[in-house]
């Protein structure tokens, strides 16, 4: 579904990605983790061409993302992305935020778009908030609207860039539940997150990045219990203690 071949990206003199290669199969859930500045978010942004790579190529479902001739509207309809900031239009209701792109970009009739949007709001558990504005919604509700908005374009791939990092702790689980449901329905997903419980329970594979490269990857059980690389073990030791202060064992995440 996704083939990333030796891509590199710099911002000025700062090398953010260095010859990164990664394949993601259809229906697979891959979690990217690593310290801040390791290139995780930039990698996501390259997958749907929010950032252009300097070398290498990316192919998603047969579409070469790195081809400058690619139709970006068509590409981004196939690759949904959800950010840590919700990016909802404040002057539009939840329903209107979801229907805007299908109506404007793909020409979906408004009534059909509204019916589909209501079904998506039901799916993410907030159908009763359809006519509310973002300012009237909690952070968790806004993020669920953002997920529904991305799903309205019927993407084949969903990218999540730290979707819970801006949320209060009590709102995190409601968003993770929606993401877990998507994974179980077979959605291909690449997720940047520090929620290691989600990673262990939902991911098919975990990829650890540092310094713009992939340091290590593996299935969750192996990754948490017997990480090979010292940098990986150091990162896991810190993040698992942060998430579970009563335990320091790498295999302790529930």
What residues fall within each predicted segment?
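ABC family nucleotide-binding domain
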Residues: 1-220
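C-terminal boundary and immediately downstream tail of ABC-type ATPase nucleotide-binding domains
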Residues: 221-254
């Amino acid at each position: 579904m996704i083939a990333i071949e030796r891509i590199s990206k710099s911002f000025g003199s700062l090398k953010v990605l260095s010859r990164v290669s990664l394949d993601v199969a259809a229906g697979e859930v891959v979690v990217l983790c690593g310290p801040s500045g390791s290139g995780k978010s930039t990698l996501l942004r390259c997958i749907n061409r929010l950032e252009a790579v300097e070398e290498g190529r990316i192919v998603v479902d047969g579409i070469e993302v790195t081809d400058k001739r690619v139709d970006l509207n068509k590409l981004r309809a196939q690759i949904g992305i959800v950010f840590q900031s919700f990016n909802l239009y404040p002057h539009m209701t939840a329903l209107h935020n979801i229907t805007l792109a299908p109506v404007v970009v793909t020409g979906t009739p408004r009534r059909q778009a509204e019916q589909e949007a209501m079904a998506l709001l039901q799916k993410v558990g907030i159908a009763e908030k359809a006519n509310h504005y973002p300012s009237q919604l909690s952070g968790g509700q806004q993020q669920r609207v953002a997920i529904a908005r991305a799903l309205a374009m019927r993407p084949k791939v969903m990218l999540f860039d730290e979707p819970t990092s801006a949320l209060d702790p009590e709102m995190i689980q409601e968003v993770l539940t929606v993401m877990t449901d998507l994974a179980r329905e077979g959605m291909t997903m690449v997720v940047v997150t520090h929620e290691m419980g989600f990673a262990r329970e939902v991911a098919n594979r975990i990829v650890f990045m540092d310094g713009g490269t992939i340091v290590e990857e593996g299935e969750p059980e192996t990754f948490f219990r017997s990480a090979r690389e010292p940098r990986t073990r150091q990162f896991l030791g810190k993040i698992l203690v942060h998430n579970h202060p009563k335990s320091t064992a790498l295999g302790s995440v529930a």
